[in-house]
Amino acid sequence: MKRYQNLKVGEAFSKNRIYPFACNELSSILNLAYSLSPKNVKALIFQDTLSAFRLLPDINTSAAVSAANLLLKSVEAVLPKQKKNLAIVEFKQAKVALKRRSKNREEEDIDIPSLPQDILIHIFSFLEISSLVSSAQVSRSWNQATHENSLWQSQFDLHFNHKVLIRMQSDIDWREAFKKAYIAANSSEALRSGRGYCSYCDSIVWHENLRCLNKQCRLKSGNKPLDLITTHQVVNYLLGIESSDDESESDDEAFPGRLWKLSYVPDYL
């Protein structure tokens, strides 16, 4: 039970950016670990599943809806009849709430004040990537501001400069460079999990821009990127299973031996 609580899956459903990652992880836990888990852990998994559906209307992004639909499929395939029916009811209520809120937004006439482009660009320079992308959909002037090359150069430096060497030129389209690097990086299963190992927390954590959410950890580490781990490794940690021989060396390095040893503590609580 302690290992599942350490993962803090349920806490992620209230966070817009992390919600899809948490749904995908919970779906994998249902598929791979639910039947092997003790009753108290099953109860926590079920409660987190209900929370995921209940909080969906508050997130209301296409990525969140897609992830919630994936979670629903796992619910239908894994949970016993009574729990499955309760979860399905919660999901249907969430969908109704989503439609109601979308309709209300369409009926509202929102007058977005027009700000000078230089002020918008300055504001957008403080946004993380998902918020920057979302801002482009608000209005034409906001969309124009989000195309500012310097914004994407900063995002590129933050996410990829430690991994990708790029020949410096004055005419680089940083938005396009970021897009290509992002697509290439997302081929990594570890990056798609939203998880990393923080040596300062000594635990598996959700990451923000590849950094621990804990401000103190970021300060102690000099804001260095976390060691990323895959959803499969998260499930293995939950079950107390060591990495298989066929996993890549990078996966093993990203999941330190000390944490593997912790996973073998008897889970009687």
From Swiss-Prot:
InterPro entries reported in the protein's UniProt record:
At5g52880_ARM, F-box-like_dom_sf, F-box_dom
Q: Which SUPFAM superfamilies match?
A: F-box domain
Q: Short name of one Pfam family for this protein?
A: F-box-like
Question: What positions does the domain F-box occupy?
Answer: 109-155
Q: What superkingdom does the record give?
A: Eukaryota
Of the GO CC terms on this record, one is: cytoplasm
Write the protein's name: F-box protein At5g52880
Which species? Arabidopsis thaliana
